[in-house]
Every structure is written in structure tokens, then in C-alpha cells.
Amino acid sequence: MKKKMSFRHALSVHFRAAKALHGVSRRFFPAATLYTVVGAILPYVTVFFSAQILKELALLRRPDVLRNWVIAGVLCTGLCAVAKAVLFQRTETMLDDLYGRKETLFCRKFFSMDYADVDKQETRDLRAQIAQNENWSSFGLMQVPEIYERTLKSLIGILSGIALTVTLFTSPVPESAGKLTALNNPLFILILAGVMILISILAGRLEEKATSYWSCVAEEATLSNRVFSFFGFIGEHKGRGADIRMYNQQNLVTFYWNGDSAFGATGKIGKLALGPIGGYSALGTGVVALITGFVYVFTCLKAWGGAFDVGSVTQYVGAATAMADSIFKLTAQLGNLKTNAGYLDATFRFLDIPNSMYQGSLTTEKRSDRQYEVEFRNVSFRYPGRVDWALKNVSMKFKVGKRLAIVGENGSGKTTFIKLLCRLYDPQEGEILLNGIDIRKYNYQDYMQIFSVVFQDFQLLSQPLGENVAGSAKYDRARATKALMDAGFGDRLAAMPKGLDTMLYKDFAEDGVEVSGGEAQKIAIARALYKDAPFIILDEPTAALDPIAEAEIYEKFNAISGDRTAIYISHRLSSCRFCDEIAVFSDGQVIQQGTHQALLAQETGKYAELWHAQAQYYTKQTPDAAEN
């Protein structure tokens, strides 16, 4: 943001931002335009009618004319004031709505973005930076409506001022005024108008200079705002309450809270606000006052010379001063436009992240017999930005309709294997085949439909239970109920008065139901069953369940999965006994593959090592054995 910003680029990026905001809220800008126009002309309406009333009082004093001017002034001013108030409420309501709708731009981008980019830390950091910019300084997308309203108001103010002051310059001083006739010289008038404009521009430049300092402290402000956002509300987080009390973490929170002084008087931001930012801003305001002085002197001299009456003095002074203020604000907004453009660049860097994953066009064959065969052929993969391989030369073929267990220590590549299978990532080496065809050649959405997955870090929404299971607002209630029953959630479902309509969690409903980790896992499993895909994948799906509940789930799954191909990932090797084949991962490679009994027979193998390490905690020992 410290790079020189061209006005053309700044204008272009703001037009794009306005177009994006108009796309999510088509009523805001028309409403804001109407409100701004009415608000901008209201001061000039007051000035105009005040001048006419004073003129009549000072000159002819005709009661009927005076009455008409008063009535017209009251009516016009009142109508404009009422219209402004009504339009203000409407515009503010739409602005609040726009704040929420603006987030859909980022949501839609996340939804359509390649998962590989969603998973990148750089992407998360960029999105956080955009949010922090908006939180601490309001720069970014939501600065665009403000710039639009202020710029439009300034332009209307300038045009209105010109309309009301044009006769200030064209009304001649009578020849009888002597030396004051010099005020009629076009060159003098041109110089005066030029000086007023230059002073207004200078004031705007000073305000622009003050605003430019904010981008210099963006990094400090962002960090400080993160500290505030995290530590300022940590006590309200119900999941942290117990730890805070058990370990006196409030002392640690206070330490970091008090240690951050970026916004304090002694911090960098505070020093700038009290120093150059405040200084330049005050200087700009002071410079504008010079214009008022010039206007008063010029207007009074012409009135003294007899160019116009006292009523016109009121009109010219008020209109010229307001016009100069509009020029000042317009110049300041043009500077703000350039400052905000840097923040908008960050926004569009995020929104313009390209989808680089190849999108095929083949459709996956809809087979009633579920005869899909998947093969990993010499597949190697490493995460973006990493030099170490997460998977190395993995080759494996899934037997259709069988149960495959994938085991291994943490970091061995199990979850990465599943992400590649679901094509959340593409491998750097090798290929993955579906019925003999590279999966990259299939239509992506079509390919995804053949998998039902329960990830270990699954998420449920704060929505009705049935909608969580179906992933849709419209769904088959009988099918959703059966899926929950098959997943072992039947007893809990029966205890819910609203059944499938029970709202999960209390984010949006006071009568929302909190579910335990184990219950949430059962709902996630039910969601996978409801999809009824040919492949069902469970990545640590029972980590929050006790061993008995886990065994029940796996026993049911053998019956539930039917002719589906099922893949299990679990640290509890007891689940492997339900599977037809087991693949053992270590350091990104498949080092063993076979049945439970066959792998146990390999006493020096990794599987036997893991099995016996867990079995000792479940094997009943005699007192003598325990002592030994």
C-alpha cells in the first residue's frame, strides 16, 4: 500500500467494487443517491429562501410577497428536511443490510475456490487482513458507499453553489462607487475565483496527507485489533471458561491486553493521531476558514459599492462558503479514494484467486450395481509450500464392495490419502483411476457424488437436525430418520420433542439443543448414510465415542454399508477386525497390506506392533502377570 497509486487505477478499482456491491444489493445505491441529493441541496434551499426574505425586508417590505416567501421557504425546507429524515432511515437500514450481504462475496469465493487454495495459510492470512482492515479503519469494500455519498454530495454542493453565486461575480458595481468599480474587472474576479479554488484544493490535500498516514500503521493496527478481538472477548467463550478458572489464565490475558499499546497515546498510532494526522487535518480546516474571509470581504465590498442588496449578501456568503467546503471535501475524498484503493487491491487479490484444478467433462457412470473401482498408481503428493512428501509412491486398488481399513501413526499420510481420493487435491506424481480412467477427466461435481465422507474435523451447522443430515432445506424425512437410527442416534432423536426439526445449538434459537461430541459424530455419520453414495469413508469417525459405542457403530456399518465400498481410518485397531483388508501407512508410504490375521502373523511388522501396544490396555491380566 506504500506504492504510488495512480488516480486512474484508484477510480477503476472503486468502480469494480461498487459494481460488486450493487450485485449483492441492488437497492442501496439508488436509495443512497436520492438521500445524498436531498441532503446536499437542503442547505442551499435554506440559504436561498433566507436571502429572499431578507431582501424583501430590506427593500420593498410588501406583506403579501413576504408572506409568500415565508410560506414557500417553510414548505420547501420542511419537505426537504422530512424527505431527508425518511431517506436517511431507509439508507441506513440498507447500509446495515449491505454489510451482511457483502460477506456473501467472500463466502461464494470460498465455496467456489479450489480446496487446495482454501487450505493455504496465505489465503487465510489474506482474508484475515481484509477483515482486520475493515474492522480497525473501515477501509475496503464498505468504504466505497461512504466515498460515493461524500463525493456525490460534494459535486452537488459545488453545482448548487455555482448556481447561487454566479450573480455575485456578474453583478456590476455602479460607476458612482469610485475605486470599488475595480471589482468589476474580469481579471480580478478570475484571480479571486482561482485563489478560492486553490485554497480549497490545498485544504483537501492536507486532509489527504492526514489520511495517508493510516496506511503506514496498517500492520500495527491490524495486530492490535487482533489482540483486542481475541483477548477482549475470550471471557465470553463458553469453551474456555473452565480452563481460564482452573489455570488463572485471566492473568495471562491481562498481561497481553495491557502490553498492547498501539492505540494508546504512547503507541505509534496514538502518536501519529496526536501529531501529523491531527495537525494536517486541523491545518486543512483552518485553511478553509480563509475562503470564508475572502468571500466576506469580496461580497461586502460589492454590496457597499451598490452591486446588490443585503439579502443577496446572505445568499452569496452562505452559498460561496458552502461551495468552498464542498470543493475541500471533494479534494479530500479524491485522496481517500487513492488510499482506499490499496485496501481494495487486497480484497480483489482474494476474490481473483484463480481455480487452477483441471475440470474434466466426463460423467461418472450411474451404476445400480455400484461397480466402481479406484486405483492409486505410483501416487506421490506434498502440500503446497512444503518440501517433504506427505505420500510417496503409493499404489493401491480398492476391491469393490469390500471394507478397507487404513491405519498408521499420526502424520503417516492417512488423511492425505483420503483427500486425494476425494480429489480435494491433485497429486504431483502418479495418477488415480476410476474404472481405469484418470479421475481428473471426470466432471468434478459428478465425481464428488460417488463419495460419502465423515472427516475427523467435520462440522455441523446451527440449523435443524434433519437439514444437517440431508444437507438441504427440503429432504426425505423418513430417509433422514432411518439414517439417524442406523448411526445409533435413535434414542436421542426419540427424546427430542421437535424430532428432526430440533435446532442444533443456540446460535439462532433459544430452544436450540447442545449435542455432545459423540452425538455430533453420530449425526455426521447419519449425514454420510443419507447421501447413499457408492463409496463411504470414515476418517476417525468414532474418536469421541466410547469403545462399546464404537464397536456397535462398526458392527452396524457392516450391515448398513451393504454393497458399498467402505474405507475406515481409525487409531483404534479393534475396528480393523470388521474389515476385509488393512493398509498400514508409515511416513507417507504403504508398508503393509493384508487381512487382520495375516498382518498379525507378521510379528515384526508395524501392524502387529501397533496392535499389541493397544491390546495391553484391554487384555485382562492375572495378579501375578500384573506384578511381573
Annotate each language-model stretch with its function:
Residues 433, 490-523, 532, 617-628:
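ABC-fold ATPase nucleotide-binding domain signature/coupling loops
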Residues 422:
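Helix-to-loop junction immediately C-terminal to a conserved catalytic motif
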Residues 498-499, 555, 562, 572-628:
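C-terminal portion of ABC ATPase nucleotide-binding domains
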Residues 1-15, 96-142, 223-269, 341-354, ...:
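Extended non-transmembrane interhelical loops and adjacent amphipathic helices
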Residues 1-41, 64-68, 87-91, 123-159, ...:
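Membrane-integrated ABC transporters
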Residues 30-83, 157-211, 306-310:
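Transmembrane helix-loop-helix hairpins at lipid-water interfaces of multipass membrane proteins
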Residues 295, 313-353:
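Cytosolic ends of transmembrane helices, especially the final helix of ABC transmembrane type-1 domains
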Residues 431-433, 448, 466-510, 554-555, ...:
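ABC ATPase nucleotide-binding domain helical subdomain, centered on the C-loop/LSGGQ "ABC signature"
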